[in-house]
């Protein structure tokens, strides 16, 4: 097979998994080539590093010392300490009560917190309410990271009454209630942004400024249900599923992530999000995790992290729907040929190191795990090998996943169609009701 034909075959394999256009993939490859060229000429440029390999970035997190008159949403911004121009490498929304979090490539940074003091809808240069000491930059690298993914940064104290002015211009639009949405129909969940998350994760995160979003104001007295979409997806994939859950009983959370990133990184970030939800004021005692497609691999990785010392008391049930536990064979071929792919595609390749590690850690025996699979439209001879039209049955029913499942349920639906099947949704609601009733 010629190089061109191999590239086309790899592209077809990827498109089968993500249903993304070939144009997006080819554009991504062109951009990567251009970024490589620019980095060769300017290897110290942290902005270029962040764009080129966001999967090699670290999650930088720290606490915020809050005064009595706690502010509304804040902005955390990171500036390149060593650059003469002191460029802003990244910025994200932050909430005083929960701290700040930002993704950054290795380097030395000055961090600053901004508040919209004049209430004009923007964070501006002269609205700095807290910062790290200018002569003590935050070092971000593998040595400072506890687990290769996260770096603990200093606590930043904020003072709303003595704002200062930063050395470089800042003008960033404020996003009111950045982590609360009214429904999955919010324009925020446009499928076009989901595709951007595959190929341009930094652009995706600049838009979302977060990972986990609640439908309506969080209510810790309810059962917390966390939904995880698949590759190239958004929470809008759950448009029919969400209304099927009783709003008086369930608080729905949406894990909204750039699905081109590596699954190890995404799984650990999801684990942190779940743990944060469970530790909110009011201490929710009932948390359910429901994931679709590749989201099941992200969720499974999160569970490995959450259950290092046994099942947390609050975790009541895990449901995966049409998840490729055995990986995707066609993507495996592309990896072996050396085709450049986004990190998540590499991880879902059949036999990938990620999948091997994933299944080496068993789920706690006291965590109910319900494995749902789809076979598309059944023929006269029963379910076919092709599965739901996207993920094969052997991959959905990988023996390692079957061995850990509390129950398995098959549905004659397509890969996405299962999320709107009335019978499947009724069964899911009944399953969640049973699993989350009563004390743990």
Region spans (language model):
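Flexible, membrane-associating and regulatory peripheral segments of lipid-active enzymes
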Residues: 24-29, 35-36, 43-225, 234, ...
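Bacterial N-terminal signal peptides that target proteins for export
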Residues: 1-11
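Helical cap/lid subdomain of alpha/beta-hydrolase-fold lipid enzymes
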Residues: 304-440
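C-terminal motif of bacterial Sec signal peptides marking the signal peptidase cleavage site
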Residues: 19-22
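Extracellular/periplasmic catalytic domains that process cell-envelope and extracellular macromolecules
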Residues: 104-105, 217-220, 246-247, 281-283, ...
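Serine-dependent carboxylesterase/thioesterase catalytic core
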Residues: 25, 227-229, 252-359
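Short, surface-exposed alpha-helical segments at coil->helix boundaries
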Residues: 235-242, 264, 268, 393-394
